[in-house]
Amino acid sequence: MDHETSSEKDRVNLNRLSMVSEDSVDHDAALTIVAVLDKVATIVDTVQASQKRIEERHREMEDAIKTIQIELLKLAQAHSNTSYTVNKLLEKTRKVSSNVKDVKSRVDKQSDQVQKVESKQEEMLRKNKFRVVIFQEDIECPTKLTVAKQSALDGNLRDDLYPPDDLSSDEEYSVQESRTSRLKKSGMKRINNIKKAFSKESMQKTKQNFGNKVNRLRTRIVTPERRERLRQSGERLKTSGERFKQSIAKAAPKKEAFKINIKKKGKQRTTAEGQEGGKEDETDSEEPTAKPISEEVTYTEVVTVKKKKKKNEENAELLLSQEDEKPSPVPEKTEKPLLKVEKKAESDEIPLVDINLSQ
């Protein structure tokens, strides 16, 4: 018995030891798994952080590229502007060079003329036969000169305008103007002043000044806001008038609505109408309107005309011949035509009659 009990105890102990060993192994495996998972999480975090950094760098690079593109566009625009300005400068330099050439040619011509004048002056100085006239702004030059020659005691003729032989050539001498020349000059000055006053430029300036004054007065009297309101109200009135005209044109009745079918009465009425046609023409022109009998007929437009006696007689004969051939139906109700006379204000003639007679 003791041996069995001891063996059982040993078995129980062994089972316990095996269970403890298995638990320890499982615990170690779980710890290793947790450690591995922690490492993986840290690696993933580092990867995500690196990705974020890379994205930020990419954004910075994109911004830098955009700025570079903008600067390149600006440089291209500046280059185009500079090329345009350079072309203009080249054109101006060409023009200046052409002008410089012209100026050089003119200067050369003037220098040649100056040389010629100097040579002539030298010749005149050598001969001592020259006279100098100095122009002054205050004293105007005369338009005409009158030279009076006097005979000297020696018998030689001398001019009053020329200085004596003893005077030097540099001295000045005055010339008296005639009264007619002065009057002519004053008249020409007045004419020139009048021309300047009534020239195109002066007239344009006066027009501009007058227009500016008128505009100022307009702005003082009527403000621009009020002027805009008046313009808007005028446009509204125009649009409303057009709409009213369109509505009237749409609502206006047609010519077919004004036509009336009137029944014939008989031979007696036709004969009476044929005989008394001339009288009815005169009476119809005097009567402006007649009352309608039927309720359906509301409005008719009838135009009356003067007829000659011959035409009335011919119409009456034609009606009699037509009604002899066809039997005249007896009307149940007599309907009188509604007549409305429209007289022209300008002409004194009686207007035409438009009556449709139908069975």
From Swiss-Prot:
Residues 45-129 form a coiled coil. Residues 227-245, 323-347 have a biased composition (Basic and acidic residues). Keywords: Activator, Coiled coil, Cytoplasm, Developmental protein, Differentiation, Membrane, Myogenesis, Transcription, Transcription regulation. The keyword Transmembrane helix does not apply. GO terms for cellular component: caveola; cytoplasm; plasma membrane; sarcomere. It is found in: Cytoplasm, Myofibril, Sarcomere; Cytoplasm; Membrane, Caveola. Residues 155-184, 227-359 are annotated as: Disordered. Pfam families: PTRF_SDPR. Its main location: cytoplasm. GO terms for biological process: cell differentiation; muscle organ development; regulation of gene expression. It comes from the Eukaryota. InterPro entries: Cavin_fam. Induces rhoa activation and activates nppa transcription and myofibrillar organization through the rho/rock signaling pathway. Belongs to the CAVIN family. This is Caveolae-associated protein 4. It comes from Xenopus laevis (African clawed frog).
